[in-house]
A protein has these predicted regions:
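Glycine-rich phosphate-binding loops that contact phosphosugars or nucleotide phosphates
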Residues: 1-120
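Internal, active-site/partner-interface "lid" segment
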Residues: 114-133
Length: 133
């Protein structure tokens, strides 16, 4: 399954930020690369990161699914997600520590779904992408 880590596209991110408002860089990447049915995972401890929220809004407009990982309140990202996993903490470092087992659980669930013993004959239809922020 193809996956793209938006923050790791350093040359695009820095070039965009040189000429445009950097809070739109992830939204622009989702607009250009995302397809209906793809999944965007938006991670923001407060849920209020403008760059993540704008990417989520664009993803929804394109028919993508949006999963948010936030702290207790969910912030603005809560309303821009199909599913928002909220770590039950308010302090940044505690939220980030609680996000670690969530990432690993999501990865294990994907591996089991796509590559588990009962799914060895799984065939992929339309190309789908998993987006990480």
């Amino acid at each position: 399954m193809p996956a793209i880590s938006l923050p790791d596209l350093v040359s695009i991110n820095t070039a965009y930020a040189n000429d445009c408002n950097p809070q739109y860089v992830f939204a622009q990447l989702v607009y250009g690369l995302g397809n209906s049915g793809d999944v965007l995972i938006g991670i923001s401890t407060s849920g209020n990161s403008a760059n993540v929220n704008l990417a989520a809004i664009v993803a929804k407009a394109k028919g993508m699914h949006v999963i948010g990982l936030t702290g207790r309140s969910g912030g603005k990202l809560l309303k821009n997600c199909d599913v928002c996993v909220r770590a039950p903490e308010d302090e940044t470092y505690k939220i980030q520590e609680l996000h670690l087992p969530i990432y690993h659980t999501l990865c294990l669930m994907l591996e089991e779904t796509f590559f588990g013993e009962k799914n060895k004959s799984l065939t992929f239809g339309k190309k789908q992408h998993l987006w990480f922020r």
